[in-house]
């Protein structure tokens, strides 16, 4: 049986291109080797974790690259929803892990992230800022979900910790007739300020200290810097909006876990460290 080499190379041309493109990432392992050597010389015992982390990131990015290539070739809007829901699920689980002492924290985080990011993307698609295609929406959703995940996790953890620290103050306010919202108003404000501050600081310094990923990618891809900043401005605005909606939503969804229907604190929630 004769092997048709032309057909073989045509069918697997994408794989050959991929393997050729991996030469530069492989060369970049030199700096990882440097980090491993420094860790060993300083007795940090991080060599194994460094190698595992880099290997895992390589595997994850390679897999997602092939998945995205497949999705982009389909030109089917349904894949946007599936990819988005998968990202929200992983983000909700991760944020819930950070706020592990909040009952049903993973569901609270997931719903909060879903609310913040879906509202933001819906508005911008409605305004025709981005076309509703996989090539645009999936990368944008990834940036928004990742940012909302961090902010939501910090908000939930900080709110629970602040209420625990000021438990007597909150209980006194409840005893005097305050609602859960009134009794925890200061704690909610503090949690939101702490969680949103990094996002706002990033907006203040964008372009001055570092060039964001979306802008850098477009410039390296050959786009005009002026075109790149237009996209980055939109992305930064979306991140602020999604993070704010997600974090505020999480505070509302946390209350049923913190208080009974009779407006009493669920003391067992705050007893664990």
Curated annotation (Swiss-Prot):
The chain crosses the membrane at residues 14-34, 51-71, 76-96, 107-127, 136-156, 191-213, 228-248. Keywords: Cell membrane, Membrane, Transmembrane, Transmembrane helix. Required for aluminum (Al) resistance/tolerance, probably by translocating Al from sensitive tissues such as growing roots to tissues less sensisitive to the toxic effects of Al. The gene is ALS3. ALS3 transcripts are mobile in the phloem sap. Coiled coil: none annotated. Disulfide bonds: none annotated. Belongs to the UPF0014 family. GO terms for biological process: response to aluminum ion. It is found in: Cell membrane. PANTHER family: PROTEIN ALUMINUM SENSITIVE 3 (PTHR30028:SF0), UPF0014 INNER MEMBRANE PROTEIN YBBM-RELATED (PTHR30028). Pfam families: UPF0014. One of its GO terms (cellular component) is plasma membrane. It is a multi-pass membrane protein. It comes from Arabidopsis thaliana (Mouse-ear cress). This is Protein ALUMINUM SENSITIVE 3. Expressed in roots, leaves, stems, and flowers. Signal peptide: none annotated. The keyword Cell membrane applies. Induction: By Al, primarily in leaf hydathodes and the phloem throughout the plant, along with the root cortex. Regulated positively by STOP1.
């Amino acid at each position: 049986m004769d092997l048709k080499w032309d057909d073989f190379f045509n069918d697997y041309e994408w794989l050959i291109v991929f393997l050729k493109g991996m030469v530069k990432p492989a060369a970049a392992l030199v700096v990882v080797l440097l980090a491993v050597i420094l860790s060993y010389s300083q007795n940090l015992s991080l060599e194994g974790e460094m190698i595992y982390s880099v290997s895992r990131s390589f595997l994850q990015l390679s897999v997602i690259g092939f998945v995205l290539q497949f999705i982009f070739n389909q030109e089917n809007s349904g894949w946007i929803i599936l990819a988005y829901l998968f990202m929200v699920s992983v983000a909700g689980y991760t944020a819930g892990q950070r706020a592990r002492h909040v009952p049903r924290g993973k569901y609270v985080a997931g719903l909060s992230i879903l609310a913040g990011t879906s509202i933001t993307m819906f508005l911008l698609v409605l305004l025709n800022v981005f076309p509703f295609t996989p090539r645009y929406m999936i990368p944008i959703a990834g940036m928004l979900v990742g940012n909302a995940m961090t902010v939501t996790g910090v908000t939930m953890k900080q709110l629970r910790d602040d209420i625990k620290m000021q438990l007597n103050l909150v209980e006194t306010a409840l005893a005097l007739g305050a609602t859960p919202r009134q009794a925890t108003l200061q704690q909610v404000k503090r949690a939101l300020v702490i969680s949103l501050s990094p996002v706002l600081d990033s907006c203040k310094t964008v372009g001055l200290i570092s060039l964001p990923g979306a802008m850098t990618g477009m410039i390296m891809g050959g786009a005009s810097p002026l075109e790149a900043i237009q996209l980055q401005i939109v992305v930064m605005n979306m991140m602020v909006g999604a993070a704010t909606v997600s974090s505020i939503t999480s505070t509302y969804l946390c209350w049923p876990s913190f208080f009974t229907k009779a407006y009493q604190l669920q003391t067992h929630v705050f007893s664990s460290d």
